[in-house]
Amino acid sequence: EFTLALVEDKVVGMGKLTVLFDGSAWLELLRVHPDFQRQGVGAKIYTRYLEQATAFRCPAIRMYTGAKNIPSAALAQKNGLHRGPEFCSMTLNLQNIPWEKEHLQGFCLANGQQAQELLLPMKEQAGGFFSINHTFYAVNPATCKGMAAAGWVYCAGENALVLGARFQPEKVWHIGAIAGDLEKNLRFAIARAAQCGVEQLSFH
């Protein structure tokens, strides 16, 4: 659901709640016009967030913010959220990166059962979350099955990776997880993304 905050029929803030594969609530796009910050607009949007999460019976509510975005973190904590793991991101520009068709060989899309078998053991290594488009998905069976259904889980024997995009797939694909031969997986990720005309790869 997309929420708008209005003052005298003027849009001064917005926010979106998305229900993820495991039913948890993901809070995103929270923005308040500079002229209306620190006036309770963000708090009102959070009130709506919590109403929605209750109505959807979400087992958890999560969000992402930059480590230096203190106001965003403070507002979230004021509304009952607490700090989770911190992640660093890396980006690779694919222009002029060499790749070969042979790097695609052996990989196929995993089904839900395969995804669970391959990805669940990675929970601790991944810090409990797989990230796609700065959306952090809790590692659990429902997430694994949902990612497989979305076409994000590739496998080749004991090698596996989560690779895809929740939005703007023409610009950036995100590596959510890697298991097995790191070099082989990365070569596949680069080749697959480049084959589809994607501009960048990102990894948390």
Placement of each model-derived feature along the sequence:
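Conserved acetyl-CoA pyrophosphate-binding loop and the N-cap/start of the following alpha-helix
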Residues: 36, 40-48, 184-188
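A short, internal acetyl-CoA/4′-phosphopantetheine-binding micro-motif in the GNAT/acyltransferase core
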Residues: 30-37, 173-183
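Short strand-connecting beta-turns/loops that link adjacent beta-strands
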Residues: 8-10, 20-23, 68, 84, ...
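Conserved active-site alpha-helix within GNAT-family acetyltransferase domains
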Residues: 39, 43, 67-85
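Amide-forming acyltransferase catalytic core, primarily the GNAT-like/NAT-type
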Residues: 79-169
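Conserved beta-strand in the GNAT
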Residues: 4, 10-18, 26, 31, ...
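Conserved GNAT acetyl-CoA-binding A-motif
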Residues: 25, 53-68, 75, 196-204
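Structural motif
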Residues: 110-113, 176-181, 203-204
